[in-house]
Amino acid sequence: MRQICIVAGARPNFVKVSPLIRAIRNSSEAQYHLVYAGREEDPTLETSLFEDLQMPQPDIYLGVDSRSLNEITAQVMAAFDHYLDEHPADVVIVVDDLASTMAAAITAKKRGAKLAHLVAGTRSFDINMPKEINRLVIDALSDYLFTAGVRSNSVATREQQSESSQTFMVGNILMDTLRYNMARLRKPALNLDEGKYLLLTLNRRVLLADEEQLRQILMTLIETTGDLPIVAPLRDNALRVVVRQLTELPVSSSKFIVRNSIPYLEFGWLTAHAKGVITDSGNVAEEATFNSVPCITLNDYTEHQETVTVGSNVLVGGDMGKLRSALADMMGGQWKKCALPDRWDGRTAERIVQILLS
């Protein structure tokens, strides 16, 4: 029986591992353990998240809680090493590009386990970004590089570090979750009509720390979107910063509907039925492409190029002229045509399990 350990480092990782767990459960040849790097009382892991995703809660919480990326790395390595003493794994699956992800990857390789990286090959090509360092380290160590698209697949293949590692373009596992839950989405109690609101999400620390740029973004949204409500489900620092900025603006911000996060299935409904999405999140941009909803990304880059080249996403960075132009197109219904990238078919988890068991 193949023993598989799945490591989640933050809330978004659970959205991607839930289909993996279903696929493993459907196999008679593998068992899994789900490990979370953080604390059991982590406020971002509301009970409704696991209920909405129809997945079990983690088997173990490593209990790491720090704002220092280096401290997180050290603490996760030590705690995960102790965990593997009692629960040896044949394969360790890590997700995305967090410090905790890198720490688990290093520990797994030192313990002699096979390492699989889910969403491998994503690059910003900015080595000053901590996540870019994490990606390079994880991919270099991985035995199985599971990529989501053509561009990331070519990057992972080109950078492959050893003959024993293999790259597989398995597709975008986020689509497995979206397709599975599409019929289960719930409309939030916000008095909204389909296609008659905008969705705003903000999370990137650099953007939130630049108060002048954030003020310009909020002002531009108010000035160019008429009477359309703007729903903004935010967490922690993003919530505090945006609420403060809105109260200090010289114009009315009453059109903003700011909420302290929102359950997963309700957020899925908001993404699927918005007139448009404004975000700094690659995952949210992917959801918008899946739903054929116009999306503006407030970054100069995206690790998910297919959302731009094939999908509904455009990049504006911090250029207010580009933001105004994109919002005008969004409001006027003049958005570009989009399609689904290759292998966004909802079968990614199935492919991964087949590869791991072959």
Predicted regions located by residue number:
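Nucleotide-activated donor-dependent transferases that construct or modify glycoconjugates
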Residues: M1-A10, N299
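Active-site and donor-binding regions of nucleotide-sugar-utilizing enzymes
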Residues: C5-A8, F14-A23, L49, Y61-S162
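A generic structural motif
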Residues: S27-H33, A113, G226-I230
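A nucleotide-sugar donor-handling region in carbohydrate enzymes
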Residues: R39-T44, G63, L141-E212, V316
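N-terminal beta-loop-helix "entrance" segment that forms/cooperates
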Residues: E40-P56
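Donor-nucleotide binding loops and adjacent catalytic segments primarily
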Residues: T47-L49, R184-H273
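A donor-sugar binding/catalytic signature common to diverse glycosyltransferases
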Residues: V94-V95, I106, H117-L118, L145, ...
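Leloir-type glycosyltransferase catalytic cores
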Residues: R151, V314-S358
